[in-house]
Amino acid sequence: MLKPVSEWIKHSFQTVENVSSDSLEQLLKEDRDRVVLVDARSQAEYEVSHIEGAVRVDPDASNMDNVVQQLGLPDVQKENKTVVCYCTVGYHGSQMAQKLSGFLANGSGRHEVLPRVYNLEGGLVKWANERKEIVDGRNKPTALVHPYNQVWGQLLEPELRASF
């Protein structure tokens, strides 16, 4: 049931590149310092669980200069960074990736090497359903995910759904 949702999101954000959960997991194992993880969900969702090391950014943020500062991207001018945005299933992650990549491209004078910006395909739902590692707000391992709403909650394995 997640696949049609992911396809709809890809169709809605055709300029956004997606990275698979397996590719991100491998990249994190190989070179975690090169990856900037952006969690584009609410604080309540982030507190239930997130990918370790992710920086939570308000999904409705419109001031991308502030977002870039929050992520530490002004300090990576000569580094080859990969930015991966995610949310519950990929919609807000794709929105954030689109805004961020557009902002960085338009302000490219600041960066000698532009970071690659992706959306995590399937979002945290796919990541958790595959039993990949997530942590709670205290950085303790957890398996639970805030489902965002009842519809997206149906995409999570029942034992992974946090009550909200």
What are these regions (language model features)?
Residues 24, 36-41:
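Short hydrophobic beta-strand that contains or immediately precedes a catalytic carboxylate
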Residues 88-94:
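Gly/Ser/Thr-rich loops at beta-strand to alpha-helix junctions
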Residues 36, 82-84:
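Structural motif
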Residues 1-22, 44-82, 94-164:
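Rhodanese-like catalytic fold shared by cysteine-dependent sulfurtransferases
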Residues 34-36, 53:
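A generic secondary-structure signal marking the coil-to-beta-strand transition
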Residues 39, 86, 120:
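Active-site-adjacent beta-strand anchor residues
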Residues 16-18, 27-32:
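Eukaryote-specific, low-hydrophobicity, charge-rich regions
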